[in-house]
Curated annotation (Swiss-Prot):
UniProt protein name: Protein nucleotidyltransferase YdiU
Sequence positions that bind ATP: 90, 92-93, 113, 125-126, 176, 183, 262
Gene: ydiU
Cofactor: Mg(2+); Mn(2+)
Swiss-Prot/TrEMBL catalytic activity: L-seryl-[protein] + ATP = 3-O-(5'-adenylyl)-L-seryl-[protein] + diphosphate; L-threonyl-[protein] + ATP = 3-O-(5'-adenylyl)-L-threonyl-[protein] + diphosphate; L-tyrosyl-[protein] + ATP = O-(5'-adenylyl)-L-tyrosyl-[protein] + diphosphate; L-histidyl-[protein] + UTP = N(tele)-(5'-uridylyl)-L-histidyl-[protein] + diphosphate
HAMAP family: YdiU_SelO
Keywords recorded for this protein, A-Z: ATP-binding, Magnesium, Manganese, Metal-binding, Nucleotide-binding, Nucleotidyltransferase, Transferase
Molecular functions per Gene Ontology: AMPylase activity; ATP binding; magnesium ion binding
Active-site residues, Swiss-Prot/TrEMBL: 252 (proton acceptor)
Source organism, top-level taxon: Bacteria
Keyword Nucleotidyltransferase set for record: yes
Top EC category: transferase
Signal peptide: none
Family: Belongs to the SELO family.
């Protein structure tokens, strides 16, 4: 394992030039202190976990110190926000410090969020707050543990400094890891500013560094776009299957890698509600849970438009047409597994839809339903979960269908239980749990953030003494709508 001074940098994006980013030095925050660190994320850089205990760790990830090989950059991009095009966005408070190469040859971006003002800050102060930094840290690592592709979070660094949002809050910094921070909005920026040379440079960079398998295709750019469509179809299927609501699916928040990116007012479903809106600024429900599938397709079409400088329109349309069937296939596969089904039957999607309809009308906890359904033999489990439903006759009718479907499955009850517990989490990042951890951290107690992170790192395993993290939320904690402010 390595120490911090042994990290190897290879800053490929910075070498694209000043048309793509602006060099900016981090602006340190006062009295930096470690709030929480992820050993799993540190391992991606081959970092010794003990490095997090050293003063230099907080100093490097709070802007007080910088590696000689680092080349901190604020990236420029644009994007569609709530459907309207914003021509110039960019990193308003984050800096790409550089790209670290681990022993396996993988490149990882080190992106410091809350690093101060940049040319793209607009009227902002360039800072992040402890609340939003903790939320992103917890979500990044929790989604990864669930098997949902996501950027990663190395650490959160707190401070004694305060900044003004709706109220005065503690300033903090988050160190985010990803193989790339290129967004759909990067391509939109060069397309709408009519910079075809830079657009092609960026496309070639992404193709070479992140989609090398597409280089040998007859049409490499088209093959890359098709793969981006495929990755996003699988990503959104995983969101929907596990009840994750992103909240701000603007094109500048969409990663070119097909990973969950830029966490803001996200939420996991508590009681199942297909129309759930987690962002209190989204008064029309554009980014509701139910709309995430069509919005992802819309965002991909915005990316396709930006790629018309190098790909013909008709092939782009054909590639876009792959999204919905690919999404449906991935989603149904995941839901079959969540229901303990190992074979495929034509009516399986209808079985899933009828279950969700019963949940919608009954205020059923989405996560705990599937967990309880897999803890006992089918007939017994149906009796247990039945108590959660309002429409008992409707649920009983579904239960008869499901029992008959399970009887056509091979294998025994114990095998079914093991399969279902491996895909149905006991612990998810409910907003009220995050809020309790944030309130403790704002009072100077980081133990709850660290405990919650540890619990969520093993979501499928029952952990002794952690039952409180696996319960239905109190009434005040249900359907919390979160602000975009960060």
């Amino acid at each position: 394992m390595k120490s911090l001074d042994q990290l190897v940098f290879d800053n490929r994006f910075a070498r694209l030039g000043d048309a793509f980013s602006t060099q900016v030095l981090p602006d340190p925050i006062a009295d930096p202190r470690l709030v929480v660190a992820s050993e799993a994320a540190m391992a991606l850089l081959d970092l010794d976990p003990a490095q997090a205990d050293l003063p230099v760790f907080a100093e490097l990830f709070s802007g007080h110190k910088l590696w000689e090989e680092a080349d901190p950059r604020a990236m420029v991009y644009s994007g569609h926000q709530f459907g309207s095009y914003n021509p110039r966005l960019g990193d308003g408070r984050g800096l790409l410090l550089g790209e670290v190469v681990n022993d396996a040859g993988e490149h990882w971006d080190l992106h410091l969020k809350g690093a101060g003002q940049t040319p793209y800050s607009r009227m902002g102060d360039g800072r992040a707050v402890l609340r939003s930094s903790i939320r992103e840290f917890l979500a990044s690592e929790a989604l990864h543990a669930l098997g949902i592709p996501s950027s990663r979070a190395l650490c959160v660094i707190g401070s004694s400094a305060t900044v003004w949002r709706e109220t005065r809050e503690t300033a903090a910094m988050l160190l985010r890891l990803a193989h790339s921070h290129v967004r759909f909005g990067h391509f939109e920026y060069f397309y709408y500013t009519q910079q075809p040379e830079q657009q092609r440079l960026l496309i070639d960079h992404v193709l070479e560094q992140h989609y090398p398998e597409c280089r040998e295709a007859e049409q490499p750019y088209l093959a890359m776009f098709r793969t981006i469509v495929e990755r996003n179809a699988e990503l959104i299927a995983r969101w929907q299957a596990y009840g994750f609501c992103h909240g701000v699916m603007n094109t500048d928040n969409m990663s070119i890698l097909g990973i969950t990116f830029d966490f803001g007012p996200y939420a996991f479903l508590d009681d199942f509600d297909a129309n759930f809106i987690c962002n209190h600024s989204d008064d029309r429900g554009r980014y509701s849970y139910a709309n995430q599938v069509p919005i992802a397709h819309w965002n991909l079409s915005a990316l396709a438009q930006a790629l018309t400088t190098v790909i013909e329109v008709e092939p782009l349309k054909e590639a876009l047409g792959l999204f919905l069937p690919l999404y449906q296939a991935h989603y149904l596969d995941l839901m079959r597994r969540r229901l303990g089904l190992t074979t495929a039957e034509d009516d399986d999607m209808a079985l899933v839809e009828r279950l969700l309809q019963r949940m919608q009308s009954g205020g059923v906890d989405y996560t705990l339903f599937f967990r309880k359904l897999g803890e006992r033999p089918v007939a017994e489990a149906l009796k247990v979960v039945r108590d959660d439903f309002v429409d008992l006759a409707g649920f009983d009718a579904w239960g008869v269908e499901y029992l008959a479907r399970c009887e056509r499955e091979p294998g025994n009850a114990e095998g079914r239980r093991e399969r279902m517990q491996a895909v149905n989490p006991l612990y998810v990042l409910r907003n009220y749990l995050a809020q309790k951890a944030i309130e403790a951290a704002e009072a100077g107690d980081y133990s709850e953030v660290r405990r919650l992170h540890q619990v969520l790192s093993r979501p499928f395993e029952e952990q002794p003494g952690m039952q409180a993290y696996a319960e239905r939320p109190p009434e005040w904690g249900k359907h919390l709508e979160i602000s975009c402010s960060s």
